[in-house]
Swiss-Prot record:
It catalyses: L-seryl-[protein] + ATP = O-phospho-L-seryl-[protein] + ADP + H(+); L-threonyl-[protein] + ATP = O-phospho-L-threonyl-[protein] + ADP + H(+). It comes from Lactococcus lactis subsp. lactis (strain IL1403). This is Probable serine/threonine-protein kinase PknB. Pfam families: PASTA (PF03793), Pkinase (PF00069). Its EC number is 2.7.11.1. Belongs to the protein kinase superfamily. Ser/Thr protein kinase family. SUPFAM superfamilies: Protein kinase-like (PK-like) (SSF56112). The gene is pknB. Residues 304-331, 464-490, 577-627 are annotated as: Disordered. Keywords: ATP-binding, Kinase, Nucleotide-binding, Repeat, Serine/threonine-protein kinase, Transferase. The lineage of its organism: Bacteria, Bacillati, Bacillota, Bacilli, Lactobacillales. Residues 307-324 have a biased composition (Basic and acidic residues).
Length: 627
């Protein structure tokens, strides 16, 4: 059993439990062999100790991850068995899952969503190049570090159990919300299966919701290969058509319509917001296969009495004799049939025209109030009111949130004819409200210049806190608030807060440890040993010979934590013999001093050097008198 605070596998100190899965628990620990470096330790639960399938799957994850070394894949450093418990030791990622990040920040800005999905694609490009298919890509299996780096993890079913899609309990391998249609049907997973899951993740990043949901896993799986993916633009009008097309192609029902590999998808997503793709039309695939198709109304001729399937040419090879013998009878039959067909057509035309007149007669309707609704909600309300959705306009608003409807034209409450067009105005938000960029890792001076240039934010709106850091160079931003992608009102009272690295901090050592003064050479060596590299020696004259060479001051003061590259000024005493005139004066003063005082002064001389340069003459005269 794993115990908090104990040493596991003779190496790892367990700090706390940080996660629980279906088969394993994850702990934060310290690697005592590597200077207490933080690690994540994944341990197979004790109830699976004798489960060969579970152990094989657990070991498969270790082997899969061990093959991959990539900045966007969680690294693995150790694997083994300890006291009958299988374990994997991985790098510790200080952050959250992508699912948690989506819940807090979605819908994400287009650029941020592209950045995240590109890092996932880059990771999977590496995995696929090694023949490894993840099979369970989902936001819960992607980590976002505190610095914003995305890392794919949990290769537990990679390349595993390809011959099986449903277990005895009707649960599918892979999370059903991100499961490709071929996996849902029980087929083997391919590179395109991972691409499908990445497309679903991109949908969720851009909209904040999953495209398919239901009451059961089977119901959701059916939707994956029966229903078209919902329109992203209806849910988030800020998404350009080219970017939505990336999702449409990645999540195509037919594997042949998807990207051939993740590199192709990366190339496409990289240009999806470029100006030359701004007029791109929506991507549509042919749905002829395995579906019933209704012919468009404009292709149907109600007066065409030709058979839908022509007779075979063999029928035309009948002899003239046979044709002649039946000609008269056929004419009579045809004339009767023609009369009947003509009457039917006439009735259909008259009845249809009457019905069309009744149906098409306009009625008066009121335009519904859709202010503050989402675009999709507004469209539904307008259609329900027997009206058509006209042009969707984008407009800034200081009162209506981004993505919500500001107004309609004609305005709500206006009475119009049914089937009239209604334009919708959607808020792009307040121009004073911006989406925060990611400044972590940037120099504070560069970040301040960007804020001023791009948003007009000056120093009065920014609070800086200096924080020591061994990881970030001095002057580099470690943490920011609001976080990347969050909203910030440039005209509001809230301030942007930056934690800025002051670099590695070293404490100035004491020059008189245990009450014993150090010479300047001893103290200089102590400073270098502490890591200081910029040491300035400042000698000061003294007539106190006992103080010669000893340090009596340092700047910055002892105990101050500073950057080891900062200048350290060491002040020490240098003995200078007094001048002859000074000696005469001192001798006169000495002769006036009583012998008892002289004796007392002489006997009180200590072994410690005096470092008070201002009293050097008095000390010197005392020494002269005693001699």
């Amino acid at each position: 059993m794993i115990q908090i605070g104990k040493i596991f596998a003779d190496r790892y100190r367990i700090i706390k439990e940080i996660g629980r899965g279906g088969m394993a628990n994850v702990y934060q620990g310290e690697d005592t062999f590597l200077g207490d470096r933080l690690v994540a330790i994944k341990v197979l639960r004790s109830n699976f100790e004798n489960d060969d399938i579970a152990i094989a799957r657990f070991q498969r994850e270790a082997f899969a991850m061990a093959e991959l070394s990539h900045p966007n894949i969680v690294g693995i450093s150790d694997v083994g068995e300890f006291e009958s418990q299988q374990y994997i030791v991985m790098e510790f990622v200080d952050g959250m899952t992508l699912k948690q990040y989506i819940n807090q920040n979605a819908p994400l800005a287009n650029d941020e969503a592209i950045e995240i999905i590109t890092e996932i694609l880059s990771a999977m490009d590496m995995a696929h190049s090694h023949g490894i298919i993840h099979r369970d890509l989902k936001p819960q299996n992607v980590l976002v570090s505190s610095s914003g780096t995305v890392k794919v993890t949990d290769f537990g079913i990679a390349k595993a159990l390809s011959e099986t899609s449903l277990t005895q309990t009707n649960t599918m391998f892979g999370s059903v919300h991100y499961l490709s249609p071929e996996q849902a049907r029980g087929s083997n997973a391919t590179v395109q299966s991972d691409i499908y899951a990445i497309g679903i993740i991109l949908f969720e990043l851009l909209t904040g919701q999953i495209p398919f949901d239901g009451d059961s896993a089977v119901a959701i799986a059916l939707k994956h290969f029966q229903e078209s993916i919902p329109s992203i633009i209806n849910l988030n009008p800020e998404v350009p058509q080219a970017l939505e097309n990336v999702v449409i192609k990645a999540t195509a029902k037919d594997i042949k319509n998807r990207y051939t590999d993740v590199e192709e998808m990366m190339t496409d997503v990289a240009t999806s917001t470029s100006l030359d793709r701004r007029g791109e039309e929506k991507l549509v695939f042919n749905k002829d296969h395995d579906e019933t198709k209704i012919m468009p109304a404009n292709l149907i001729n109600p007066y065409d009495t030709k058979p839908l399937i022509d007779k075979k040419e063999d029928n035309d090879s009948q002899t003239d004799e046979k044709a002649a013998s039946s000609e008269v009878g056929n004419k009579n039959k045809k004339s009767k049939k023609g009369l009947i067909i003509g009457l039917i057509i006439l009735l259909l035309v008259v009845g249809g025209a009457t019905l069309a007149w009744v149906v098409s007669t306009p009625t008066n309707v009121k335009i519904p109030n859709v202010t503050n609704s989402t675009l999709s909600q507004a469209k539904s309300k307008i259609k329900d009111a027997k009206l058509k959705v006209g042009t969707v306009h984008k407009q800034q608003s200081s009162t209506i949130a981004e993505g919500k409807v500001i107004k309609t034209d004609p305005t709500s409450g206006t009475t119009v004819r049914s089937n009239s067009s209604v334009d919708i105005y959607v808020s792009t938000g307040n121009e004073d409200i911006i989406k925060m960029k990611d400044f972590v890792g940037e120099k504070i001076d560069e970040a301040m210049a960007t804020l001023l240039k791009d948003y007009g934010i000056d120093e009065s709106q920014v609070t800086q806190t200096s924080v020591p850091s061994d990881s970030y160079p001095a002057g580099t931003i470690i943490k920011q608030s609001p976080k990347k992608g969050s909203s910030f009102d440039t005209k509001g009272s809230e301030k942007i807060t930056f934690e800025v690295s002051s670099g590695k901090q070293v404490e100035v050592p004491d020059y008189k440890p245990n009450g014993q003064y150090m010479t300047y050479s001893q103290y200089q060596a102590a400073l270098k040993a502490a890591g200081f590299t910029n040491i300035t020696l400042d000698p000061q004259a003294t007539t106190n010979q006992q103080a010669d060479g000893y340090v009596y001051s340092v700047y910055p003061n002892v105990g101050t934590s500073v950057d080891p590259t900062q200048e350290i000024v060491v002040t020490y005493s240098v003995y200078t013999a007094p001048s002859s005139s000074s000696t005469t004066s001192e001798s006169t003063t000495t002769s006036e001093t009583s012998s008892s005082t002289t004796s007392s002064t002489s006997s009180s001389t200590t072994s410690q050097p005096s470092t008070d340069n201002n009293n050097s003459s008095k000390e010197s005269s005392t020494t002269s008198s005693s001699s």
